[in-house]
Amino acid sequence: MDIEKMTTTMQEALGSAQQIAQVRHHQVIEVPHLWRIFVQPNSFGANFYKDLGIDLDDFTNLIEKEIDKINSVEGSNITYGQNLSPDLFQVFTEADKIAQKMGDEYLSTEIILLALFELKQNPLTEYLVSHGLTKAKAQAAIEKLRGGDKVTSQNAEETYKALEKYGVDLVAQVKSGNQDPVIGRDEEIRDVIRVLSRKTKNNPVLIGEPGVGKTAIVEGLAQRIVRKDVPENLKDKTIFSLDMGALIAGAKYRGEFEERLKAVLNEVKKADGQIILFIDELHTIVGAGKTEGSMDAGNLLKPMLARGELHLIGATTLDEYRKYMETDKALERRFQKVLVTEPTVEDTISILRGLKERFEIHHGVTIHDNALVAAATLSNRYITDRFLPDKAIDLIDEASATIRVEMNSLPTELDQANRRLMQLEIEEAALKKERDDASKKRLEIIRGEIAELREENNQLKAQWEAEKKEVGNISEKRNELEHARHELEEAQNEGNLEKAAALRYGKIPEIEKELKAIEEKAKSDDLSLVQESVTEEQIAEVVGRMTGIPITKLVEGEREKLLHLPETLHQRVVGQDEAVEAVSDAIIRARAGIQDPNRPLGSFLFLGPTGVGKTELAKALAENLFDSEEHMVRIDMSEYMEKHSVSRLVGAPPGYVGYDEGGQLTEAVRRNPYTIILLDEIEKAHPDVFNILLQVLDDGRLTDSKGVLVDFKNTVLIMTSNVGSQYLLDNVGENGEISEETTENVMSQLRAHFKPEFLNRIDDTILFKPLALEDIKNIILKMTSQLAHRLEEMEVELELSEEVKVWIAENAYEPAYGARPLKRYLTKVIENPLAKLIIGGKIPPKSKVIVRLIDNKVDFDVQSIAE
């Protein structure tokens, strides 16, 4: 017996059998040791016996018992599992004879399985024969398995039933009802049929964006083959989807991958045109399995494709086709392109209506038609980086899964009742230990409450169980209907008209009637604890979760918040009514859903002197909308003064450092499409920056350096500038009004600085007024209240007299600098002295500091707060 003349699988099996013998302290390798390896799950031997009707669990138990009967030998100088037992040696001797007779170069597993029958008295042989597996039957199965081939390589077992092992029969999947229906795409399916019917170049490749339904077209073809809705030349053909991953996985030795692929191709060749091969992600064949000196899958396929011996359908995306397939011209010309475009919203709704029943059965929910329409329209509008119908199907699936999880979870009412009951029971247990009258009285009250709650709890639980059962009945009946329809389809395909008639006119109408009655009952019962309907509201919630864009119906609290948005913004931004109003209106328009869907929510240019609240307004808006001013894309345009720095907004071009990182503007918006973009000090930027902003302002879109389209339709663009601020400072009226002449002067300076095509695209240009003395007082009030809030954490109260506030306002106010000097002045005259007093221990906790003005100087009076 030469181990080198065995196949790799056989060598590994013998090695594993030796390990069993060593672990069990058996001196020699016996027949049961080796057979224990042969019947391991998914092994060649296990599949062989299973196909021939042997109960593997029963057979494995027998092998284990036989191993247990072998005596263990103990000792210090004993070697275990180094030799074969006489029985096993006889099996190998007989196997050698059979292999020579069959003309095999290597000893393979199936020959060893056949040689076992030569051991007439062996319990394993007796078991197999008693269960109907004779030597003749096993030999016939081996001949069928091999298909007349001889074992000429060490990977022989890998090549048996190669298509079954490395592929999925799509036609068989359709027959078993494991495939979703394919709706529409008739034109593309006809194109594929036309290409498959050609004499040469009869290999279609489906090219389209990810998620448009390329694989579904092949599944649709498989469904047509089952329905016999194809030309004569395609009737009774089988489509096998080849799994390239499984083909490559575990190919350890050089040539093993090629051998597996050749085995697949030989099976296809032997089928004489009855098998159509489908390779999803076709580009993977270019370079697949290529190691030093070996061929890749693409080159192995070329000869058969050229001779027309292989019918192959491929599917790949546009980018991958260009990157991999077009580089290999010889391979590319053997395929005929079939372009698969993205379906329209209307087509997507039709597709969703076709899939609706499948999702209802899988999740056990009811999907309303308005949810399907919402999924198609909302995904098309808000999820811009993916394609229909995939993104719409995802929304339906996600919303259905959410409802399903809620159905299986405890309802809020029941959960609250349970928690309250637990709380009262804990209180009852504590009061039992008390002896005073008040506790006894309270205990009686609590026991009464517990009794009431338990009754309410039991009622709720019974109602919930009943509602769940009702929903479960609907789901079961839908499953029954689906099964009956599948049976009808099978009967029609087989030509069993009697069965088809019984199903169509008897069983199916009866189930439909029962289902309708159950659904009507559920509707009239008005399920209050179990929500089993998927409506447009759930779809909107899912879109909101995925994109961060709020599109759900407004709840009462949010309505109030939006209507009072100007007042809320004024709490942070003093004055500037026009600017606050314009920004608030843009947000209200967006949430009402009436803004132009092809433009940003709003684009504003804020003009005015420094320190009047331009940037502060953007921050206040971000805080109000997103609860944090960090949720704002702030770009300081002074960083973009050089021409070359423009590329940082959209990303560096290919070949430059930072190409992989993406643009600062595009990446921020791509990750968070609902945001506020603040372009601060825009006049400082290079003029080329404005060219990039043109399409953002007009169409709400921008293409980054990688060619990815970024959607700006859900952003608010705020640009700030100091252009013309001198006119505003010099010519503002006493009551803070800006004269028409001043406005015209500012606008003319603006037109001189920015191009007309840029200014023309901005929704509103707003002039910020210089701050009046009254505004300054309000700002001081705001700043001092912030300081007082910080001191509260140290248990110190702060009080400023009115004259101090007026004095700070008069001394700190400089119209040219706005509100910024106030902060500096307040730090100098209030915060610094306060800090020194705190560090010196003169302001202990639980004290009050009153700030007064004495002889034109600030005085701090520290008082203790009485407990």
From Swiss-Prot:
Main location: cytoplasm
Pfam family, one: ClpB_D2-small
UniProt-annotated stretches for the region Repeat 1: 6-70
Region NBD2, residue ranges: 558-770
SMART domains attached to this UniProt entry: AAA, ClpB_D2-small
Top-level taxon in the UniProt lineage: Bacteria
GO cellular component: cytoplasm
One GO term of the biological process aspect: protein refolding
Induction summary: By heat shock.
Record bears the keyword Transit peptide: no
Keywords: ATP-binding, Chaperone, Coiled coil, Cytoplasm, Nucleotide-binding, Repeat, Stress response
Clp R domain location: 3-148
Positions of ATP 2 binding: 608-615
Family: Belongs to the ClpA/ClpB family.
Subunit organization: Homohexamer. The oligomerization is ATP-dependent.
Known role: Part of a stress-induced multi-chaperone system, it is involved in the recovery of the cell from heat-induced damage, in cooperation with DnaK, DnaJ and GrpE. Acts before DnaK, in the processing of protein aggregates. Protein binding stimulates the ATPase activity; ATP hydrolysis unfolds the denatured protein aggregates, which probably helps expose new hydrophobic binding sites on the surface of ClpB-bound aggregates, contributing to the solubilization and refolding of denatured protein aggregates by DnaK.
Protein's name in the database: Chaperone protein ClpB
Organism of provenance: Lactococcus lactis subsp. cremoris (strain MG1363)
